[in-house]
Every structure is written in structure tokens, then in C-alpha cells.
Amino acid sequence: MENGASSEGRDPSAFLGEIIGAPVTVKLNSGVVYRGELQSVDGYMNIALERSEEFVDGKLRRSYGDAFIRGNNVLYISAQ
């Protein structure tokens, strides 16, 4: 499988720790997508991104220096 996921039951927190500093895509439950460099993620899936961009309906809406995303809004995180 892609992005470090496998059928052998890999720990998601280990995967997230490995991609700190890497470019990621974060999709929210609302369908909004953020792309940026993963700065941190906590046990509640709260996410901090650097050099982030917000995409709505596939179109760039806004660019941010830093973005903080509340974990209960996150549908998935994908390493780019």
C-alpha cells in the first residue's frame, strides 16, 4: 500500500513521526484540502503546517505561512 500503510498493522503515530518536515496533503471532512510542510501533529490529530495552501473545489483559494487544523476536522493525511 502507499504512504507507509500496510496490511501488517503499522502504527499510524510512527508513520506521522517519520513524515514531520515532509510535504503533506490534509483533507478535511468539508472537502477543503490543505497542502504544506508538516510541522507537528498531536494525539488528537491537531496539525500544524508551514508554507501551506488551501484548496477549495480543487482551486487554490489562499496561501498561509502557518496553518493550524483541529483534529476532529481531519478526514486524512497523505504524504506527497
Swiss-Prot record:
Classification via InterPro entries: Lsm6/sSmF, LSM_dom_sf, Sm, Sm_dom_euk/arc
Subcellular location(s) of the protein: Cytoplasm; Nucleus
GO MF annotations, alphabetized: RNA binding
Pfam families with a match to the protein in the record: LSM (PF01423)
Subunit and partners: Component of the heptameric LSM1-LSM7 complex, which consists of lsm1, lsm2, lsm3, lsm4, lsm5, lsm6 and lsm7. Component of the heptameric LSM2-LSM8 complex, which consists of lsm2, lsm3, lsm4, lsm5, lsm6, lsm7 and lsm8. The LSm subunits form a seven-membered ring structure with a doughnut shape.
Protein task: Component of LSm protein complexes, which are involved in RNA processing and may function in a chaperone-like manner, facilitating the efficient association of RNA processing factors with their substrates. Component of the cytoplasmic LSM1-LSM7 complex, which is thought to be involved in mRNA degradation by activating the decapping step in the 5'-to-3' mRNA decay pathway. Component of the nuclear LSM2-LSM8 complex, which is involved in splicing of nuclear mRNAs.
Name this polypeptide is given: U6 snRNA-associated Sm-like protein LSm6
Gene transcribed to yield this protein: lsm6
